[in-house]
């Protein structure tokens, strides 16, 4: 850790795994898809956005949209971004107080997350930004 001054090591938080992380994927400020992720024996377990509580998903989308709008005021518009939400640090009760856990500027797009539909919109957005 001492040698790498710009390395962020994120500890595994069991609370995040208990309630799952809601990950929202955006291209050019527009929501493309979301999913919920937990971990089991080192492997990611994914739930599609249809399986996420609609009210929770709506709140996450609204918060992420505000964040992306604020970021674009101070920096260039992000072509791709993933805004992750988590719940309940040091709290084992069921709650819905999700918060922004992570902002990934250039996230990966595994097939199981995007159901195979993430690459075409991303490629189109990149090409449009380059023209």
Model segments located where?
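Phosphate-binding site of ATP-dependent enzymes
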Residues: 1-74, 86-89, 97-99
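C-terminal active-site "lid" helix and adjoining low-complexity regulatory extension at the edge
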Residues: 75-78, 87-131
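Catalytic phosphate/metal-binding cores of nucleic-acid and nucleotide-processing enzymes, i.e., regions
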Residues: 81-83
């Amino acid at each position: 850790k001492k040698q790498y001054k710009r390395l962020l090591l994120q500890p595994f938080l069991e609370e995040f795994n208990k309630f799952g992380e809601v990950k929202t994927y955006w291209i050019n400020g527009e929501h493309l898809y979301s999913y919920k992720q937990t971990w089991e024996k080192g492997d990611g377990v994914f739930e599609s956005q249809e399986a996420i509580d609609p009210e929770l998903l709506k709140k996450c989308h609204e918060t992420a949209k505000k964040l992306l709008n604020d970021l674009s005021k101070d920096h260039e518009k992000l072509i791709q971004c993933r805004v992750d939400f988590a719940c309940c640090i040091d709290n084992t009760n069921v709650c819905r107080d999700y918060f922004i856990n992570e902002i990934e500027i250039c996230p990966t797009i595994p097939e199981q997350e995007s159901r195979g539909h993430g690459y075409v919109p991303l490629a189109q957005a990149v090409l449009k930004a380059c023209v």
